Every structure is written in C-alpha cells, then in structure tokens.
C-alpha cells in the first residue's frame, strides 16, 4: 500500500479517537491523558470476546461498551471529586496521567508482554486510486465516515447535542438556562468513552497485532490532532486527524517509521508555541 493509503487508514482511526477526546475536553474541562489506556483496554476486551468464537465485528460492541463504562466510572470516581475541590486544572491532568500509567501497566501485568491478534480475515484486496486496501481497511474507513456523520447529526440537530454545545460554551449560563449540566457531562463521558472503545478496537484491527503498551505514544497523536484543529472543536479535530494521519505516514516513507511520531510531536510543539487555540479555534477557546 502507498504511504498515502497508510495515512488515510491512520487518519480514519485517529479521527474517531480525536473527536471523542476533543468532545470530552470541551464539555468536561478534563484533559484526560488516560484516554489511550482506555483505548487499549477496550481493544483487549474485544479480543477476549473474539477468542470465545464470536465474530470480531460483534465483539467490537463489547469494546465500545467497555470504553463507555470505564470512562463514566473514571469521571464519577476520580475526576469529579478532584474538580469539586477546585484544584488547579494541571492537578487533574497529572491525576489522569497516573490513571493512564495504572491502566496500561495494570493491563500488562494481567496479559503479559506478548503480542495478540484478532481472529479475522482481512478480506479481498481492492485497488483504488493507486492504493491497495484490504476489505477490513475499507470497512474501517466506512466506520469512520459513519461515526463522523452521526457526531455531526448529534451536535447539530439533537437536544442533547445542543445542550452539550451550550455546556461547552458556558457551563454556568447553560445551567441557569435550565440545562442539566451534570447529566450532560455524564452523557459526554459515555459518548466519548464509546468512541474511545471503538477507536481502540479499530486501531488494533488496523495494526494487525497489538500488546498492552501499544497505546504508549498514541496520546501524542491525539494531542497534536486536537491542538491542530483547535481544543474543543470537534470539526477541527476531524481536520487535525486527517492532517496528522497523512503527515506521519507519508513522512515514514522518507525517515524510519520508528520516528514518525516525532512529526506529530513537532506539530504539537509548534501549535502550542504559536497558535495554542488551533486552526479552527479562537483565543477565547483557551
């Protein structure tokens, strides 16, 4: 497959993850660095269900459910109590980093350090615009497109989506206008967690093989995509994911693939230094 094809698949997976990550940050004001850990744990839940003879496409729903439940629990048990104490935002970020380390290395202690793979067929290979894509990769792109359309519909045309946007813009004003902000925040954790679980599973499908620390550098890609598009901007996150996915994979054709995350890190540093509110955000976003 061409580097553009690899970039397209990477962007599709990253788009699902980044949109959930951005929504979570925008509505809840929590920069959840444990997002990658929840992704890989969800991928393993899908793997365990798949090992019992269930199709990976059905087992995928177990991963989505895991991401939603774990994210909701993290908010209720850990993040909300810290936020109620009116601590500095960086404190919650550090707490989320600790949660990430516990989630990743706790999983590694349970499953070991060996690589695993799903029981699935890659399907026929298709030639399209100079790219060779497997059936699974085409399905992943289709899932990404479907999810992004659903997120657009949710945010634009539903009462829940409008309440989420209002809570993100001004939580106190939304509360005074009758929006049940705590309920909206809980629903945001569930929805973004479901996206996290889905992203973890399709990430593992695309990787072919994975292990407990496969998410190690993924948070850098998430942060780069989010800050490129704009913190709290779901549509910006879609663009950021496409740009980061393509740039990291295309650059891997010219430098060793082991260092392709460096491109994302440089983008992240550049955005933080010169335009921290992103290409699609505004200064009031931060």
Model-identified regions with their sequence ranges:
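Cytosolic-side transmembrane-helix boundaries in multi-pass membrane proteins
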Residues: 110, 169-176, 180-183, 255-286
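Alpha-helical transmembrane segments within multi-pass membrane transporters and channels
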Residues: 54-99, 239-244, 275-276
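Short, non-helical or kinked segments that cap or interrupt transmembrane helices
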Residues: 21-42, 56, 86-90, 160-163, ...
